[in-house]
Amino acid sequence: MASNENLPPNVIKQLAKELKSLDESPPDGIKVVVNDEDFSQICADIEGPVGTPYENGLFRMKLALSHDFPHSPPKGYFMTKIFHPNVASNGEICVNTLKKDWNPSLGLRHVLSVVRCLLIEPFPESALNEQAGKMLLENYDEYARHARLYTGIHAKPKPKFKTGAISESTTALNVGQTNNETPGAATAIPSSMTDIKRVTTSAQDQQHVANVVVAASASVVTTTQKREAGLAKVQADKKKVDARKKSLKRL
């Protein structure tokens, strides 16, 4: 694999300058993906131009720089599968800027812009994908349908998740829960099934004790009532005996 060691120091310095410029001021619809450890592989994400079959697609491509760059042109490849006359099945890009029209003074910005323009205006006369080239010349609607199908399947951008919104929602939920709590009050929440069983068992024990107390109280009341009734009967019988004794004395 090529690396910075395969490029002359002056070329690395120039590439670093160009990549910084591309990062700070990217071309329309192009974002360069920089790998500081390997300037010989320049990757970029290209947005499908509006009004073309590649619209709403995001295509990853790369420029492979040889050890004698910039005296020899880089090789361009689409890493995202695309249906295009000037892109071979292995992703290789055919455009004159990267072949006979190459000039060492051309920078990366120019090359990337040319590749994106190729999505706007293909050149079926120099097709690497013969099917796409023939279809473009004979039946544009069918060509566009195929290109849109490939775009929808292979070049669909990945969704971006708003982590900030999720954090804000979580914070709002926590604030709402805090506001509903009574200051100074502590609510014990069972943390496991064991705790729940303990709480349930405790409640059952308390209810059982309560039932026993009620039953015992009722028993005491009943016993007391019986004792009082028996005492009253004894007193009544004693009165009867005393009355009989008095009657006998009179006789």
From Swiss-Prot:
Expressed in seeds, pistils, siliques, hypocotyls and leaves. Self-ubiquitinated. Its EC number is 2.3.2.23. The keyword ATP-binding applies. Residues 241-251 have a biased composition (Basic residues). Belongs to the ubiquitin-conjugating enzyme family. This is Ubiquitin-conjugating enzyme E2 22. The gene is UBC22.
